[in-house]
Amino acid sequence: DPLTVAHATRMLLKDLRSFAHPRWTQTGFRRAHGSEAQGTTMRNLFGQVDGTVNAQSGTDDFDELVWAREGWIAGGTSMVVRRIHMDLDRWDRLDRSGREQAVGRTLANGAPLTGVNERDEPDSAATTPIGFPVIPEFSHLRRARSDDRTQRIVRRGRRGPPATSRAAST
């Protein structure tokens, strides 16, 4: 609810006035609570499911990834904000196959290109009849997954309004 978020933001900023001041702000949004069934993976502005393999809150996997166990941050966590430009006009020019190849998942339900359902384990060794990987090595799915536990993170994507372009206004 944008009204609730605006009020909470104002209260936080008001209470921090004597300690800090904002350097920049970023508007973002997710689906409103209750607008989708529990456990539904959100979609990004490209229309792709986003965050399928994130560790789920309340699990040992989540706790291991999020909560520091030692050092100055023991019992705490950290956060990185990364702003990613999404070129929606260029994305619109890709056909369905190109979009699915770029992400490594189907548009319809987010299943890996080697699976049927969103949470199916992708088969990285599967190849096409002419020997190309079914899930391309450049795909988001391959690049975002790692077997090295030290490279795993929990992502909490927020969507911002897309920039208006000439293509969108004509």
Model-derived features: where do they sit?
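Long, histidine/aromatic-enriched segments associated with O2/redox biology
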Residues: D1-T170
